[in-house]
Amino acid sequence: MYDSLDFDALEAAGIANPRERAGLLTYLDELGFTVEEMVQAERRGRLFGLAGDVLLWSGPPIYTLATAADELGLSADDVARAWSLLGLTVAGPDVPTLSQADVDALATWVALKALVGEDGAFGLLRVLGTAMARLAEAESTMIRAGSPNIQMTHTHDELATARAYRAAAEFVPRIGALIDTVHRHHLASARTYFEGVIGDTSASVTCGIGFADLSSFTALTQALTPAQLQDLLTEFDAAVTDVVHADGGRLVKFIGDAVMWVSSSPERLVRAAVDLVDHPGARAAELQVRAGLAYGTVLALNGDYFGNPVNLAARLVAAAAPGQILAAAQLRDMLPDWPALAHGPLTLKGFDAPVMAFELHDNPRARDADTPSPAASD
């Protein structure tokens, strides 16, 4: 079975106990890895990980910062900054670190910079790096939990871990294709959304801002096991995503147990808040959601939103009682027929003067107006 392996040569090259690890070494040999590649992996303490690691790499490191800069027509400092904004590091300015694929990817950024300007292009790198880092962490957590054999601490068997890791890593290019497809759909959705909220060529938009969170979340984290907390947050995130999208909104971000979203109209903003607070899943789990809402002109930058309406909505959700929706006065004025009770004035952090708010309730008439009648459906 191991006739093709020269154990003495492998041991002399630096691979410890090759005969005891014959199964792993044969597996790597059958995958086409050279002795040199195995030795390098052994030096990194990752011989068991070589089969999967190679599928994660973008290619052999052939460019230093200086040679990559020459290839791209940039300074080495610009290349280093771009790589840093992506959340990535290089071993040193003169150490080959970047692959051909890395440099080709940066060439796309260089071309984009010429189209949209330096600030926009650098901002995109920051967003991309943050998003990819979060995605990578989510994937890693998913794989560790769903395929425990990927961990040596679980199997205590290098060959079993190598096979499991390889099977998981083979999804990397397929997930890349999935990302490309989903990205295209989200670009089309974002274009449609922004067409409804932009007023000029600036980055400012006029829209509704919503925040919602789980009441007494700190107490929940102390009462639940990690597994129960994971299930709770997973279900909450899924419910929020479904509700916001169903009501025509766009998710901006999750912050622990809180979510921020934007809506193109006051009606859609409030409908999403009502559906979140009254969500049957939350009631079944005996959870209480609260929300804070505002409407106005904000700065849309790098996938996030900034401005007074954002600050106001964030402060209102913090002031809301469990199961309560607090809306800014301007939003209330835009929905005169929506059931509301005056609440305030409130003293909110960051606001010099007390702020008038309104507690909003469900509006069955608005819901009925959104639902086609049987006759209209025929």
Swiss-Prot record:
Disulfide bonds: none annotated. Residues 208-317 form the Guanylate cyclase domain. GO terms for biological process: cAMP biosynthetic process; intracellular signal transduction. InterPro entries: A/G_cyclase, Adenylyl/Guanylyl_Cyclase_3/4, Nucleotide_cyclase. SUPFAM superfamilies: Nucleotide cyclase. One of its GO terms (molecular function) is fatty acid binding. Belongs to the adenylyl cyclase class-4/guanylyl cyclase family. This is Uncharacterized protein Rv2212. It comes from Mycobacterium tuberculosis (strain ATCC 25618 / H37Rv). The lineage of its organism: Bacteria, Bacillati, Actinomycetota, Actinomycetes, Mycobacteriales.
